[in-house]
Amino acid sequence: MSEQERIQECLRKEIRSLLISTKDGLSPQELEKEYLLMVGNHLPLRILGYRSTMELVLDMPDVVRVCPGAGGTVILKAIPDESTKGIASLVAKQRSSHKLRNSMHKGRPSIYSGPRSHRRVPYRGRVAPILPAVVKSELKDLLALSPVLLSDFEKAFAKRFGRSFQYMQYGFLSMFEVLNAASDVISVEQTRAGSLLMLKKSVTEEKPRGCPAGKIFTQPFRMKQGSYSTGFPVAKPCFSQPTSNMEPPKQIMSMEKTSKLNVVETSRLNHTEKLNQLENTFKSVIAQIGPGGTISSELKHKIKFVVSKFPEGLFISKLLGEYEVIFKEQLSPKKLGFLNVTELVGALSDILHVEFRKGHQDLLVFDADKKPLPPVQSDKKIEAKACVSSPPRNSLSTAAVKETVWNCPSKKQKEPQQKICKKPNLVVKPLQLQVETNKSELNLAMANHDIPPDAVPNKKLCRLPPLDTSSLIGVFVEYIISPSQFYIRIYSRDSSELLEDMMIEMRRCYSNQLVSDRYVMPECFIQPGHLCCVRISEDKWWYRVIIHRVLEKQEVEVFYPDFGNIGIVQKSSLRFLKCCYTKLPAQAIPCSLAWVRPVEEHWTSKAILQFQKLCGLKPLVGVVDEYVDGILNIFLCDTSSNEDVYFHHVLRTEGHAIVCRENISSKGFSELNPLALYTTSSGGPEDIVLTELGYPSQQHYFNEDRKISPQSKESELRILDEIPTGMPCLESVTIGDDIWDENWLPLQAKMGKGGDAASHLFTASLGGKNQYSSCKEMPQKDWCFSTPKDTWDDSWQPSGLVNGTKVEVHKPEVLGAQEKNTGTNRTQKQLDINGSSDSSTLPKLEEFCTSLTQSEQSADGSQSEPNNSQTQPKQIQLSTAAPCSTTAVDDSAEKPSGSVESSPEILKNEDFSSSRAITLYKDKRQESVDQLSLILSYECQISQKLYIPRSTATAALGAAARLATSRSLLHWYPSVKRMEA
């Protein structure tokens, strides 16, 4: 028996004993108090997984019987078992002590005390009661400030209103029933901290959420109270939304009959009066259906009487005070179920009219009868009026409507509207008028193909630039097909936050009905590969999509370039994408888990399910390995726990995958890769900068770095086999003189053949065989590495012939007593770059020779090996001005013209000088030499990138994982692993 089962069994006995000893039973509050007095601890609800006492006792039907009590209370009585039947019969024969019961009620303040006439009907059956409007307004007032966790709800309610929230007073058994009854104003979102109660900002019909996998926008979509522009489609006061199959409510059909009977009376009215009458009819129907229908007609007349006394308008903040002065009674919006007076006025749009005038910070309320509405001229003004009628619940104010609505409607659309409005059946069939008007406008727009000027008719998004090898990034796994085929999204300020900002702007723009209708895509533009945007019906956010396939029945299959998944949407929901929303590259990156392959030919369902559980909806740390056929092969690590969890290790341990030392091309992406099909590539920012400056890109040096001798390849494979297979630790280390550690300093090597003079590198040479013998003698944690291409620093120019300038790097001889005793030969490294042809090729350019000198402190005497004329090098420190990477080659390789000549040497860099001198000389033909000495500051000596040393152990990143971004500020320290051409 587990610990939890033992606690539950003991709790059942204790609760039965408490309830049996009480003849009349106990309420849930009394049970909690009696248990605390008897045991000394509270009920172990959280340990057993319960959230309330009622939930606990309902899970014990053989121990507790729930009985309704007086005043809507709940009484808990015990159900005796075989061993307690005798005790229960003795307790039942006892006399009931009325004095004790009365003293118990007097001793504690009861929420049910009061006259019998005010007691509620006992709660019977399983049908939850209705939450009173006063309580609902209190809940809205509490959650309007900020969301509240369910565990902190009682504390927050007591702090706000000075009393505890007694839900049983209203006939509810638990908070679950309260939240279900208030589901129209409160939404519950599951978070890591628990259930989060949030105030719904809209009040339309709630629908199940079905957005692309991994997105963080989880608020449900509901209609706003008082916002009638998004109510029933037929009852909208604007003529802009196309409607196909409409089933009008019964109330609207009755209004149709009323309007038919009044055809004779209204036939003499002019065109403008007919439109005004139609608009007022719609408003009255909406008011009866909406929240205003709950207000009594007597109260409406009183409010209208107060407002009518101010023909020039009454400030909305003074409405309650004027009402109290006239009728000598208070008007409380909260008792009517409204959050404030503004929401109350917005619900009474059939009798009140609201305006906002410049120069006033408050809204003006008018009597709808005495303040006639201005004549209807366009859809724009009608939409503005609908927005003004309910300002607190509408996300767009009047000023926002004026800014976001398309301000320049075409003349071609105005003329058909005027012609259609002249039809004689305008008043007789108002619903048909709206449908025909919308259809005519839509057909006209499609016929003329009048698209907005800032819409994107034919354009492709750019992909994110390739990531640097061995860089650490924070990622979200958005869409998973298999461990070899999934999409990630980078978690950083330059990617995820920009995407969120763009989606908020898109929602703000396209949520305006006039703007949304203006950007409707005609049928002729709906073609595969077209970039557009869509709002899925279950969500309230707008997404960038690319049309993948055109299906039957007015449906299309679209690809989400920011999340990686494919979905089916309606053609009518597609909208043109504004040009400003195409600047952000597609955020989804196709990936494959590095170094793994399935045990069988394909991934099993268990392996895919395990990989989905590992990813979850949380930020992970990704270690970039390489790109294979344009697909990023990446290691994934979960750092949320105390120990780092590498996904490829977990899949191998559970028998789902085989770990190999190479990356296999993904079969799924080779069959279909929508991102590569519909987007264009974008070069890395560093390569673009280098190309603009006239220098070769990093890829050029990387390609040159591949050209190594066969002997060097074999040597490197020997080193690679000796490197431990564990993943490296994730601590970041800066390279500086003050914290230098020579145990893991990379051994530098010289460059072999190079096609371009700019690709020659300056390093000290290494003895081929001695180099590796030294590595074996070193401790296991000290490994030989070569600097990769990602250590390039744009602030330094590559050596060689750059823009007609010759660059030489010298190491001056430093005279000292220690050098004479050790007999160490100092070398001078010089690059010969066909100087004779430079003057003829570039006669107008003056030759310069740059000499880079570095002051160093000499080390102790070196150790020479027997039978070897060359001295074994240990660690070599390059200047921080080293422009590019180096490659280890054999010393016996052929040295062509233009290569680096050097001799063996020993440099033990225990301490470096705190200054670096850069000397510039003019051409040797000039007798005068101008020298400029630059002393680099301490900040310049430290490398501008963070490096991570390799080790067999791993360390938890913790919060540092959130700092890993796509800027490649974190790098593994260089490895000898190479990519074959």
From Swiss-Prot:
Residues 98-118, 808-908 are annotated as: Disordered. Belongs to the TDRD5 family. It is found in: Cytoplasm. Residues 98-108 have a biased composition (Basic residues). It comes from the Eukaryota. The lineage of its organism: Eukaryota, Metazoa, Chordata, Craniata, Vertebrata. Residues 7-80, 127-202, 295-369 form the HTH OST-type domain. PROSITE patterns: HTH_OST, TUDOR. It comes from Homo sapiens (Human). One of its GO terms (cellular component) is chromatoid body. Keywords: Cytoplasm, Developmental protein, Differentiation, Phosphoprotein, Repeat, Spermatogenesis. Residues 525-584 form the Tudor domain. This is Tudor domain-containing protein 5. Its main location: cytoplasm. Residues 819-842, 850-889 have a biased composition (Polar residues). SMART domains: TUDOR (SM00333).
